[in-house]
From Swiss-Prot:
It holds the Pfam family MBR1. Residues 307-316 have a biased composition (Polar residues). It comes from Saccharomyces cerevisiae (strain JAY291) (Baker's yeast). Could influence the NAM7/UPF1 function, possibly at the level of mRNA turnover. Participates in mitochondrial biogenesis. InterPro entries: Mbr1 (IPR031443). The keyword Phosphoprotein applies. It comes from the Eukaryota. This is Increasing suppression factor 1. Belongs to the ISF1/MBR1 family. Keywords: Phosphoprotein. The modification Phosphoserine is found at S119. Residues 50-70, 267-306 have a biased composition (Low complexity).
Amino acid sequence: MIASEIFERGVQDPFCQDCDYEDETDVQSFLGSNDLNDFVNSKLASFSFENSSKSNNSHHSSSTNAGNTSRHIGNHTIGHHLRKIKTAPHHLYGFVPANSTNNSNEPIRPSPRRIRANSSTLIHQLSRQSTRQSSLGDAADSCFDHKCIKPRSRHSSCYGIPTHLYGLEKYVSSELDSLAVANDQSNDLTSPLTSVSTPASNSNSYLNLNSSSAAYPSSYLSNEKNNRLKLISHGKISSNNVPGHSGNLNHYHRERTPSNLRRESFSLLSNGSSSSPLQTRNNSYSNSLVKSPSNSSLNTSVASSNEESSPHTSNCLEERNPRRKSFIKLSLASSFSN
């Protein structure tokens, strides 16, 4: 049981020196303190008798040689026999009997039972000290060079990950470059189309048509004709300009310019349109209410909003100067014509 406990302590903490003194009380309680002391005293007495006989035989030799040999033999014999007693503590050298003689000047101390463990602790401490000094030196150099880099230690294995990633990047970089070039080329090819497809007029216009008629198929042109006819039926576009410009998309694009809008407004005024633009728009919405009963809710809301806004606009026109009335009429006519 005692041996198993000693073995467990040694396995759990092989560098602990306090384990040498922990089992003293257990051994004394197991064997008895008197028996242990008598046994140790008898052993030490026999060792001292052997040392005294050997010192008498070597008395004719020189004093220095005699001291060295006796010191060597005494330490060796005592250490050898005491190491057999596994549970004897280190401080038993104080129980040496008084009749024993020792020619050496140094006190007799038995060798410790855990020499390998103690040496391994010393080696471990020295290795850690060297590692700590090297890490501190690396940190000082990095701080001096203004490079905040964590010093590498032999216990860390995370420094292999960036190297591994960089190694993979060698094989992936060519494919990434090719994909990037392909994406750039595709963007360059699609950019003219997007620039052509963007409308060059106001976002509030009813038709966003392109100046180049070749970019649209015949089905798109037919749809545009149908949309144009629907706008004419609702009164949003005058039917006078339909036969001359029904299939010309460039004319639709030119209609949205300010100069063309002014020309159309002058042409409308010269043709004798006595009714105001607000009245024509209200009439067109009333016609749309009659023609499309399915959209009654939407049309009624629009008509009501127009009826509410018409007195306010008429009052504004009356309050302003008469010279500006013609300009306001022209601007309203140009906006409603589109």
